[in-house]
């Protein structure tokens, strides 16, 4: 079960990143998986921090994982991806085909859109997600977690946390030359990976007392409850299994 704490439509993770999109349990498809992250704590963090800054990011990596399909795909692993050519068809005139370029995964997230406090990840769905609804040839479509791994320092203490944001790959995804083979992105599925993150965060860095929050209970798949910040007991389980305000 994963609970999600939401303030004004933003999802606060057990870390420094704040998720603008997608919302929990959203059915997704289309050309790309779009993820929007605020990496400034809504203006409280420097985009170019000093090495000895008491609160700062080290790295964010993202994977798409599923216990249903037992698959694990790289969205961004912190490295610069290889640029891959593909043939771009031009309407009906095959003689005017041009070579275009794509990448299998997204580059280092904190380096995207330099100078911007919001990072937009547009990950092209690989071939095995092509289909509509539950129909596909390779069995990849279904329920997934956007698994966000954060390495960061908060108040002079270093942490490594894993946060799972549940979505479903159930909307239509059409064939495209831009889609890469899934084997290029696939990693070993490790269901116990989040358990390796074994530190408890003492709170959420950017949600204080008196802030009106909405907690979506993952066990009930979307039931909501409201609360007032962290004025009562709060416990973040860093492994991403339980998140939210304990009222």
Regions found by a protein language model. Give the residues of each.
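Fungal secretory targeting signals
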Residues: 1-11, 227-247
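Structured recognition/catalytic domains enriched at protein termini
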Residues: 2-145, 149-198
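C-terminal GPI-anchoring signal of eukaryotic secretory precursors
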Residues: 193-238
